[in-house]
Amino acid sequence: MTIPYLADLKDQTECKTCPKILTRCKGSLYKVILHEFLMTAGAYFGVFLVFRFAINETQREYAAEVFKKLKEQQNVCIPMQMMLAFFIATVADQWEKIFENVGYIENAALAVATFLPDGKEKRDNNGNVILAKVDNSNVRRNIIRYLVLSQILGIRDVSELVKKRFANYDMIKATGVLQDHEEPLLKKVPCKTYAESFVPITWIMSILQKFASKNEENLYYDTVYLEITDFYKKIIKLTRYDLIPIPLAYPQAVFLAVRIYFFFCLFTRQHLDLEENWALSHWGFPLLTTLQFIFLVGCMKVAEILLNPMGQDDENFECNYVMDKNLFVGLTIVSSEHTECPELEEVIGDDYVPWYPDDCKSKEEKNQEELKKYLESVDFQAVTSSDQGENDEVSTMMKVEQNSLLVCGREKFYEGGGFRNSDVYPKQRANYPH
């Protein structure tokens, strides 16, 4: 199953985000390249010992000349970066298409639950029952079961994990998806060697035909038909990707080029100057070559994993989980107790304001709320001029603090520790709700 790691990337400002990702082991880069790295490192040090101690001076000088000439032509003759880039792009595009065709049953289940409802009871003018209420929940549940059965029969031909779980009909019957009386019908299919996943779909179409003949006024069976056929199309596309993969010569060329490149690195990355003082890097560890091996071989291993996402690696699709989810979620959607709509009440009006908990609010929103509270708490006092008579209008002025925002101005207010949001500045009190 693909390893989830996005929770470790929730906050990019934390210094521990990168170590969390790099220290994961299951499905990691280190795990996929470990064996090849150990083999290559062992071969490198084997060449190192032979070059230093097992041959004489004349042979060593001749070998050094050969190694130098190989090093000059190595990067020219083997365009590693270009080959890997094109190959990974092609494989990643195929991986994305395969992922899009791992079918989920929610759309089909919602269509079945909506357009194949329970039959309502009908009465005549005298109150006599002319048509009893019909419970179609069993029909809806069997349609979901047939969809999952079709998915099992199709995907087990391309997924190793599904094939291991459902190797034969008895294993499928153990899950309840296939019944005893349905097994002979599957065995009678003459082309089951090529495809048998269509059989449960034909059973569903037979059910829809019976419903359409009984309920001629219902014109929505085509919606159910389209959702079911879309679900089946995804199953067929998965089998086609397995039947007709990327041409074999393309991955062969890339995989061979990477191995040959690092085979030559066993010789061209040796330290050839024997008169120079030997440093630790010459004796012990070819650091830059090791980093190049990790990155290039790591990219190649990623391409190998993406090439067959239906295998048994840590990063392959867990189709067994998808089918279990489809069965349980589909049966839940079409069950009668979940198809009834609750009583409708007007709980959201035109004055609806989005609500956020305090820990989800941004600093700007918090500053605006503090500013509104400040303006609402300001006192207003009536001021009457001594020159005004009794009938003159009374003017009002707002009472503010000496160091407030309205007195000091925005710049001095912020310097004194006021609201930090420079975009928030009150123009009129009437603009803010009371």
UniProtKB/Swiss-Prot annotation:
Keyword rRNA processing included in the entry's annotation: no
Any matching Pfam family: Bestrophin
Keywords: Cell membrane, Chloride, Chloride channel, Ion channel, Ion transport, Membrane, Transmembrane, Transmembrane helix, Transport
Membrane topology of the entry: Multi-pass membrane protein
Domain of life: Eukaryota
Gene Ontology molecular function, alphabetical: chloride channel activity
Entry's localization field: Cell membrane
TM spans (from-to): 31-51, 76-96, 244-264, 278-298
Isomerase listed as a keyword: no
Predominant cellular place of this UniProt entry's protein: membrane
One cellular component (GO) term of this entry: chloride channel complex
Oligomeric form and interacting partners: Forms oligomers.
The protein's role, per its UniProt record: Forms chloride channels.
Entries under PANTHER family matching the protein: BESTROPHIN, BESTROPHIN HOMOLOG-RELATED
Family in the record: Belongs to the anion channel-forming bestrophin (TC 1.A.46) family. Calcium-sensitive chloride channel subfamily.
Name of the molecule in the record: Bestrophin homolog 12
Source organism: Caenorhabditis elegans
Primary gene name: best-12
